[in-house]
Curated annotation (Swiss-Prot):
Pathway the protein contributes to: Amino-acid biosynthesis; L-lysine biosynthesis via DAP pathway; (S)-tetrahydrodipicolinate from L-aspartate: step 4/4
GO terms of molecular function: 4-hydroxy-tetrahydrodipicolinate reductase; NAD binding; NADP binding; oxidoreductase activity, acting on CH or CH2 groups, NAD or NADP as acceptor
Residues that bind (S)-2,3,4,5-tetrahydrodipicolinate: 167, 176-177
Reaction(s) the record says it catalyses: (S)-2,3,4,5-tetrahydrodipicolinate + NAD(+) + H2O = (2S,4S)-4-hydroxy-2,3,4,5-tetrahydrodipicolinate + NADH + H(+); (S)-2,3,4,5-tetrahydrodipicolinate + NADP(+) + H2O = (2S,4S)-4-hydroxy-2,3,4,5-tetrahydrodipicolinate + NADPH + H(+)
Name of the featured protein: 4-hydroxy-tetrahydrodipicolinate reductase
Binding-site positions, NAD(+): 14-19, 40, 106-108, 130-133
PROSITE patterns noted in UniProt: DAPB
Enzyme Commission number(s): 1.17.1.8
Amino acid sequence: MADSTGPISLTVHGAAGRMGRRVVALGLADPNFQLVGAIDHAKSDHLGQDSGAVAGEAPSGIEISSHWPVLDDAATNQAVIDFSLPEAIDGCVEHCVKVGSPLVVATTGLSDEQKQNLSEAAASIPVVWAPSMSLAVNLSMKIAEQITAALKDVAGGLDVEILERHHRFKADAPSGTALKFGELIAGQLGESTSHVHGREGHTGARTREEIGYHAIRVGDNPGEHTIVFGMLGEKIELNVAASNRDCYASGALAAAKWLIHQKKGPGLYSMFDVLGMSDN
């Protein structure tokens, strides 16, 4: 891996998207980074346009392109942040493996096959992948695990429901973050846990083994998750909400810094690793 001194040469994959623009904007403002590439799909209306201007900032001198940049200095620190779509991720991973670039994957809605491809890529390069780049969300996931562990055997039983709210443009439901909350909670509840997505009609009484998911798509909500832990006589509601998209962009940049500055070798890492909260 490259030496960890000097600015990180940053390429943003999905640079013309809502999240990619914020990564570009925050990356340009951060002296730890030097933007060297802004990639979008071949049919993007923004090809050839300055990535800084597209992001609403001063011109960066880096045009949005469908072709990956060729770095002049192979020893330069480099990292790729991917905020694209599932159909675009495979080419990004292939490129990073080819050039040996550390990769931060923030795209959600990946198939099982794509997740497996990420795991295989991580044998060659360091990869951070998480369903949410938000520091607050990842901390909340650890809190949700602790609440579940403490209350799973409470008299009368523990009911867990997950509500998530996102903007009308979000394509996948439930969100990857909601599913990760559920995965961690189920890990505490046991193997018999079932996952129920919404309810309609005469469903009968709720079973103690269920985790319920409810997805709301409205307006421009950048993301909100509420985990309800219900017991007989009382409840806990754990709520984490984004005020804007910058929390996701800054989290992705923090992950890229972590990969480079900690000189991480090949492996599949999570935001728990970035935050120093991993159980491994």
